[in-house]
Amino acid sequence: MSISKKIVFVTGNAKKLEEALQILGTSFPIESKKVDLPELQGDPIDISIEKCKIAAREVGGPVLVEDTCLCFNALKGLPGPYVKWFLDKLEPEGLYKLLDAWEDKSAYALCNFAFSEGPDSEPIVFAGKTDGIIVQPRGPRNFGWDPVFQPDGYKETYAEMDKSIKNTISHRTRSLQKVKEFLKSKGYENCKFE
C-alpha cells in the first residue's frame, strides 16, 4: 500500500515515545512531533478525542495522541487525567500520601491512544488498563508516577521493573496492541510512501 504521509505521534515526552516505539516496533511509519496541545479537562475518552482532533488540524495528516491517567479507587478515579498536575505539585511521595486516610490503596493505570487519519476524520480511541496498588515510592524517578504504581501480581513498581517486563503488561502496552492491530488492518504496516 502507498500512503502519502507518516503517522505523527504528537508528544514531547521522550520516555513515552521510546516506550511506544519499543511496543509498536519498526514496521509502522511513525515520527514524533511536539505540538503544544491544550491541557483539557473532562472524561478521559473525551479528552483523548478532542486532543486528537486538535492535533490532526495542526499536523494536517494522520496523528496519534496519548493521554494517561492514574486513578485511585478510594478517590473515585482521581487524580485521573489530572495526575500530571498532582505529580508536579506533590511528587511521588505526595501521590502516595493522598491515600493516607483510606485503607483502599487499589488503583488502575489507564492509557488512551487516539488515532485520526486527518483533520476531516473522526478519531478512534484505544484504551488500555492495568490494575494495581499505590505504594510508597520505589525505584528510579525518571518517568512520572511509575515509582508509586505496583501492578497486580508483581512485587515491583513500574519504576523497578525491567523495561522488557513493563512493556508486556503496562496500560500503554495494552492500548498500543490495539493500535497496532488497527494500523495493520488499515494497511499501515510496512507501507511505502508516494
Swiss-Prot record:
Signal peptide: none annotated. Its EC number is 3.6.1.66. Keywords: Cytoplasm, Hydrolase, Magnesium, Manganese, Metal-binding, Nucleotide metabolism, Nucleotide-binding. GO terms for biological process: deoxyribonucleoside triphosphate catabolic process; nucleoside triphosphate catabolic process; nucleotide metabolic process. One of its GO terms (molecular function) is ITP diphosphatase activity. It is found in: Cytoplasm. Its cofactor is Mg(2+); Mn(2+). It catalyses: ITP + H2O = IMP + diphosphate + H(+); dITP + H2O = dIMP + diphosphate + H(+); XTP + H2O = XMP + diphosphate + H(+). Mg(2+) binds at E39. One of its GO terms (cellular component) is cytoplasm. The keyword Cytoplasm applies. It is an enzyme of class 3 (hydrolase). It holds the Pfam family Ham1p_like. ITP binds at residues 11-16, 51, 67-68, 84, 143-146, 166, 171-172. Its main location: cytoplasm. Binds 1 divalent metal cation per subunit; can use either Mg(2+) or Mn(2+). Transmembrane segments: none annotated. The keyword Ribonucleoprotein does not apply. Homodimer. Belongs to the HAM1 NTPase family. Pyrophosphatase that hydrolyzes non-canonical purine nucleotides such as inosine triphosphate (ITP), deoxyinosine triphosphate (dITP) or xanthosine 5'-triphosphate (XTP) to their respective monophosphate derivatives. The enzyme does not distinguish between the deoxy- and ribose forms. Probably excludes non-canonical purines from RNA and DNA precursor pools, thus preventing their incorporation into RNA and DNA and avoiding chromosomal lesions. This is Inosine triphosphate pyrophosphatase.
